[in-house]
Amino acid sequence: QQRTATVQELCEALDASESTIRRDLNELDRMGKVNKVHGGATLPDSQFLADEPTMAAKEALAVAQKKCIAKAAAALITAEDFVFLDAGSTTLALVRELNGPALDARYVTNGVAHARTLAQKGCKVFLLGGLLRPETEAIIGAAALYSLQQYNFTKAFLGANGVALDAGFTTPDPEEAAVKATAVRRAKEAWFLVDDSKFARVYPAVITELHGGAILTNRCPNPKYKQYTLVKETEE
């Protein structure tokens, strides 16, 4: 598969004028479908993946970055908040960083480790019922979705295995994606906690498009993401 094409090649292949091709390339570049280069365009270098590390393996990755993101996320929570936390490793790091007024907020989670840690901190926590997925220790399935639909959240904090301009926020498992997507819809504010290694990665199950949630990251490697959603960086 050819990943790079010149304007002239596209004109000949599509039997279109140069002005039409350039206009279309501008629009595709804005959408994140291609990257404009001098005289043509290339396909974005999004990496398609499908593997799912265990929760223990995830916790060992990008530890310093996750801690910075977690601290910034914890600072967004007030005592009056009603918060959803999904079963990601970065959201678990967030739970460990909770202090002060954030301890008086109320929490709903589908993460077993999250619920246990919240309870140990003295927080009021509701654990969703449903099917336990061993790989991520997440509660999923119809019962979890039904429970989620009974709540309205002031804030939701979620993880994603990948975030890409052309694919939005994605994850390997469709059932986990369904829980995350439902939480996004039920929240006034939805924050995706993703370290810089997650950018330009695409997984099989879509959570939401890029404009569906704000991004809290240690570093955003591509300024184009800021054209579609709010991006907060801890390394600014």
Regions from the language model: what does each represent?
Residues L61, Q65, D86, R106, ...:
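Short, well-structured alpha-helical patches and their helix-loop capping segments
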Residues Q1-Q8, A13, S19-F84, R96, ...:
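HTH-adjacent hinge/linker in prokaryotic transcriptional regulators
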Residues T4-L10, D15-S17, R30, K36, ...:
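Conserved phosphate- and dinucleotide-binding cores of soluble alpha/beta proteins
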Residues V83, S89-L92:
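Gly/Ser/Thr-rich loops at beta-strand to alpha-helix junctions
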Residues K66-A74, T91-L92, L145, A177:
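Short, well-ordered alpha-helical scaffold segments within catalytic/effector domains
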